[in-house]
Regions:
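Membrane-interface segments at or immediately adjacent to transmembrane helices
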Residues: 305-388
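Terminal transmembrane helical anchor/hairpin motif
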Residues: 1, 115-202, 206-216, 234-263, ...
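Hydrophobic alpha-helical transmembrane segments of polytopic membrane proteins
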Residues: 74-99
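Short, structured surface segments that line ligand/substrate-binding pockets
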Residues: 363-401, 472-502
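Selective transmembrane-helix segments that form parts of the transport pathway or gating/packing helices
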Residues: 36-65
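Central hydrophobic cores of alpha-helical transmembrane segments
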Residues: 101-114, 265, 287-300
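Internal/C-terminal transmembrane anchor helices
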Residues: 225-232, 273-314
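Long, hydrophobic alpha-helical segments
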Residues: 2-25
Length: 535
């Protein structure tokens, strides 16, 4: 499918235009009485015919087995359109260089360039911005990464084609229009036409004497020199930092700026001068390139300083209530939950926690050197905002929470809201007006269990909801809840949920109902009822 189209698009481009990479062969071919555009399209159509012939052979052989042409024709159309795009992109890469080994490097680099840049930005932000967490790549990044975008659109569980073992498996009940597969192919084919027009123009203007050079055009030299210097300097610089300064400063909430600058500057110099030597085919390149390399190094150092100083205000940003569609919260010593924009009380409580964490960080109370906190505990908090414009903002903090601190008060206020009290007690599907039809109480300590009748399950379920509404649920984040020895499950017609008895307060109605049920007896592993005497 898509992966094979990606591979053969690059390999065929190398084979078809290999004559451009050798001075003798390009001199011979270009001495023939043929226009360059004629040579260009002859090679292109030859490669496309080779790819299509193989696909047609697969279809003909498959027809002998399944005899159903419809799905096979869908597969043929999809794979052919994907191959048109990747062959066009490989052709463009072959026009940009005169060195055969540079073609696959350019081909892979162009396919993943935007994604690689975004990943470097995320890594740099995670090193310098307190609590920063990288989100999924946005739609723009995915569209600029064709092989990933097409693979997602065409090979997922609801896509057009699923390729598992090297040959296409097409299901008759899979619609080729699901997930915008045809639209994505149409867009990339239109882009392929533009790419081929650009490649043809470059082929006409290409200088034959530059065959064998890494850059087939003079303007490609600074692009490659500074592009490799920038990407390589940042990537290798962060890797070097992680294995040197990073290992010695594991408890820092941010990267050590002087160490990061040293690593980035060193790797930028290595990558930039190394690329200059490759482009110039000489070791004597310092006089011609040192000014641009120093400027690039200073620029990357300035970027690191700006990210460390949080010039854009990324670290301090707390989205406004009007911008929030929902917030997903993960917190140690509490269950995960999601608050929607309709629940303004919980939203405001979460925003208060976010502000309290930042204020505590501003005061310097984020030391991670010790595992123990006086009169408190380290709490891990992860917040994922889904905003109304479709974007997302994610933060994760490991902070000391001390009693009487603003953060302690903010977390406890969030835990006392109705939605959070519900998520602490109930896991699964639970609604206040639902009618249970049964349930089970299981002792993890002895292995005994008790099956609940519909009436017993309903009384237990109602008691739990009353405790949630009346606030008979622990709302202190530093309270040790320990482990529960009872597993309580309640089920209805089309739903089921579990009760977490750890979070009920001592006077909760739910605990009283459970105690009454257990006094009436258990069923052991043999199905026999055992009555427990009152203590």
């Amino acid at each position: 499918g898509v992966i094979m189209a990606f591979v053969f698009g690059g390999v065929l481009a190398m084979a078809l235009y290999s004559y451009l990479m050798n001075g003798r062969s390009v001199g011979l071919i270009h001495s023939l009485p043929l226009k360059r555009q004629t040579l260009f399209f002859t090679q292109l159509l030859t490669g496309f015919a080779m790819l299509t012939a193989g696909n047609l052979l697969v279809v003909l052989v498959s027809l002998l087995v399944c005899g159903e042409p419809g799905p096979l024709l869908v597969w043929l159309a999809v794979v052919t359109l994907a191959e048109i795009f990747f062959l066009a992109l490989g052709t463009l890469c072959a026009m940009l260089t005169g060195w055969l080994l540079a073609v696959p490097v350019l081909y892979v680099g162009i396919n993943f360039l935007v994604m690689a840049v975004m990943q470097l930005i995320h890594w740099l932000a995670e090193l310098f911005i307190y609590g920063y967490q990288a989100n999924d790549f946005g739609s723009f990044t995915m569209w600029c990464t064709p092989v990933v975008q097409l693979a997602r659109r065409l090979t997922d569980s609801q896509g057009v084609i699923a390729e598992y073992v090297g040959y296409p498996i097409v299901s008759a009940d899979v619609s080729p229009l699901e997930n915008g597969g045809w639209q994505a192919l149409g867009i990339y084919v239109a882009v392929a036409v533009a790419i081929l027009a650009l490649a043809c123009m470059l082929c006409i203007r290409r200088r034959s004497e530059l065959s064998g050079d890494v850059a087939a055009f003079p303007w490609m030299r600074p692009v490659l020199r500074y592009g490799v210097g920038c990407m390589g300097g940042l990537a290798l610089g962060m890797i070097l930092y992680s294995v040197t300064f990073g290992l010695a400063r594991t408890n820092d909430i941010r990267a050590y700026l002087p160490g990061m600058l040293l690593c980035v500057v060193l790797m930028t110099l290595v990558c930039s001068f190394g690329m200059s030597m490759l482009l110039g085919k000489s070791l004597k390149i310092f006089r011609r390139t040192w000014k641009g390399t120093v400027l690039l190094t200073a620029l990357l150092a300035a970027v690191c300083v700006c990210v460390r100083m949080d010039v854009a205000g990324v670290e301090r940003r707390v989205p406004k209530t009007s911008e929030i569609e929902s917030i997903s919260v993960q917190c140690s010593r509490a269950n995960s939950f999601t608050a929607t924009s309709e629940d303004t009380e919980t939203i405001e409580a979460i925003r208060a926690i976010h502000r309290a964490v930042l204020d505590q960080m501003k005061d310097g109370d984020v030391d991670l050197d010790g595992a123990l906190v006086e009169d408190g505990q380290y709490i891990w908090i992860r917040l994922k905002y889904t905003l109304t414009d479709g974007s997302a903002l994610e933060r994760a903090y490991n902070v000391p929470v001390r009693r009487a601190s603003a953060l302690y008060t903010a977390i406890n206020h969030m835990m006392s809201t109705p939605q959070v009290r519900q998520t602490l007690v109930f896991s699964g599907e639970a609604e206040a007006g639902a009618v249970p039809q049964g349930g089970t109480i299981y002792s993890l300590e002895t292995g005994d269990f008790r099956n609940l009748t519909a009436a017993e399950a309903q009384s237990l379920y109602q008691a739990a909801w009353q405790d949630v509404e009346e606030g008979n649920v622990i709302s202190d984040i530093l309270t040790e809840t320990g482990y529960t020895l009872l597993q309580v499950d309640i089920n209805g017609r089309n739903w089921d949920c579990a009760l977490d008895t750890r979070y009920f307060t001592d006077g909760a109605k739910t605990l009283a109902v459970l105690d009454r049920f257990m006094r009436n007896g258990w069923s052991n592993a043999d199905g026999l009822t055992e009555t427990t005497e009152d203590s």
